[in-house]
Amino acid sequence: MADPIRSYLDFEKPVAELDSKIDELRALAANGSDISEEISRIEDKAKAALHELYANLTPWQKTQVARHPQRPHCIDYIAGLITEFTPLAGDRKFSDDDAMIGGFGRFRGESVCIIGQEKGSTTESRLKHNFGMARPEGYRKAVRLMDMADRFGIRILSLVDTAGAYPGIGAEERGQAEAIARSTEACLNLTVPNVAVILGEGGSGGAIAIATANRVMMLEHAVYSVISPEGAASILWRDATKAQEAATNLKVTAQDLARFGIIDTVLKEPPGGAHRDPADMIARTGDAIAQAFSDLAPLDPKTVRTQRRQKFLDIGRRLG
């Protein structure tokens, strides 16, 4: 992924000021000034400030981090983890959907089916991928690929990053709710192991449709919820400005969801979030995925499906 000019969130202002000071000093050093000790001192101060800040993020701040425009996306993880990736297109019923990436490749030498939502990173790509909000044909494409992988005994990896399924009129006319339900059903019926990773946002049924997996992992600063904080605030308080309060009450964070048993693993992010060191985050995620598939490898197909179904039934009974 390209190294764009760093974008700071509102709450990162203290770190932004220190980084700006470091850049100024480096410019002076380039002109021959010997200020290496001062630069080192401020760099240490910036690292400490960043560590303290990210160790105490509120749920709303984590939501902002999960949406960071420079956070690595689905295609970045595919590029970093998958070899011989061959994308497949179309749902064989209506059209293709660029919001839902799908195909086959190799993960650490073994065949894998990859399904994931792509938000895009530029204006052009965001429009192309519809900001990661899949339409019915995207979920039907996912079902087609899951069925294909299941027939050939190929493991499935889901990379989740969406604000939710697309709520447009056309999507509703083409059966958005049914498509999401069928995709969730397809996940539950798989006899091959599937692993899901919440990379950034896990928005409602749009995320669950490909995240109903044997193992569900979340990045440390990702969020996963039935509704966005802004949406919940608008419904509960008729005031979208109460999003911060809504985020706290929704329990959207990986830490909350791990405590409730909804997800299995929290993947630690580099200091300052995944967007500050995408390569490191992608490598960490790859190691966790490999471990999850290794743990599931000894299970026979019937047990793989039974354990997955029982897992989600238990969540419903425990929290319902």
UniProtKB/Swiss-Prot annotation:
Picking any one GO biological process from the record gives:
fatty acid biosynthetic process
Keyword annotations from UniProtKB, A to Z: ATP-binding, Cytoplasm, Fatty acid biosynthesis, Fatty acid metabolism, Lipid biosynthesis, Lipid metabolism, Nucleotide-binding, Transferase
- The EC number(s) this enzyme carries: 2.1.3.15
Q: Which InterPro entries match?
A: Acetyl_CoA_COase_a_su (IPR001095), ClpP/crotonase-like_dom_sf (IPR029045), COA_CT_C (IPR011763)
Pathway involvement? Answer: Lipid metabolism; malonyl-CoA biosynthesis; malonyl-CoA from acetyl-CoA: step 1/1
Q: Write down any Gene Ontology CC term.
A: acetyl-CoA carboxylase complex
Top EC category: transferase
Query: Does the keyword Cytoplasm belong to this entry?
Result: yes
A molecular function GO annotation: carboxyl- or carbamoyltransferase activity
Q: Where does it reside?
A: Cytoplasm
**NCBIfam families hit by this protein:** accA, AccA_sub, PRK05724.1
**Subunit structure as annotated in this protein's UniProt entry:** Acetyl-CoA carboxylase is a heterohexamer composed of biotin carboxyl carrier protein (AccB), biotin carboxylase (AccC) and two subunits each of ACCase subunit alpha (AccA) and ACCase subunit beta (AccD).
* Entry protein name: Acetyl-coenzyme A carboxylase carboxyl transferase subunit alpha
